[in-house]
Regions:
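Extreme N-terminal starter segment of soluble prokaryotic enzymes
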Residues: 1-6
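Short, well-ordered alpha-helical microsegments
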Residues: 47-48, 114-118
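Active-site proximal beta-strand in glycosyltransferases
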Residues: 106-108, 122-135
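N-terminal strand-loop element at the rim of the active site
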Residues: 7-15, 19, 27-82
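Glycine-rich phosphate-binding loop signature in dinucleotide/nucleotide-binding domains
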Residues: 98-105
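Short His-centered aromatic/hydrophobic patch
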Residues: 88-91, 109-115, 133
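Conserved donor sugar-nucleotide recognition element shared by glycan-biosynthetic enzymes
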Residues: 17, 21, 84, 88-91
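Histidine-centered beta-alpha loop that forms part of the nucleotide-sugar donor binding/catalytic region
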Residues: 10, 66, 111-112, 133-135
Length: 135
């Protein structure tokens, strides 16, 4: 049975983490295609422009169907923190349900890691949590 890997990388700006996340997910599929089932969580539409590329590389996408990406403030320290808070509260229940129902073996968090950290600490999941820091 394949192990499930979920990627959580909600990014506001096209920073290096986008490329890092894509490369990591593609590598997991390429070198572990018989061992791993790779899924990227599209929390608020931030991965929409990469959907064709992800499908071409056999990476599944789970959409939370919040198309907020265009509307969230991205520039400035305080404005981006407001966006992070919105993402945290809007995605809390969907992410909790997702982990509870689909039970990934590995959960790799790249950005806005406070949300998955909170969920993993509040609940008893068998999921291995990997905090990935890039850049």
């Amino acid at each position: 049975m394949k192990k499930k890997i979920f990627y959580w990388s909600p990014c506001l700006n096209p920073v290096g983490t986008v490329k890092s996340t894509l490369n990591s997910a593609i590598s997991a599929m390429k070198f572990g295609k018989d061992k791993y089932d790779v899924t990227l969580i599209n929390a608020f539409g931030e991965w929409d422009e990469h959907s064709d590329f992800l499908k071409k590389n056999n990476i599944k996408i789970i959409n939370f169907n919040y198309k907020l990406y265009k509307y969230l403030p991205k520039k400035g320290f305080f404005q981006s923190r407001i966006s992070y808070l919105i993402i945290y509260f809007v995605c809390f229940i969907p992410l909790l349900r997702l982990i509870k129902t689909l039970k990934p073996d590995y959960f790799i968090a790249h950005l806005i890691t406070s949300l998955p950290l909170t969920i993993m600490n509040l609940s008893k999941f068998n999921t291995k949590f990997i905090l990935r820091i890039s850049g």
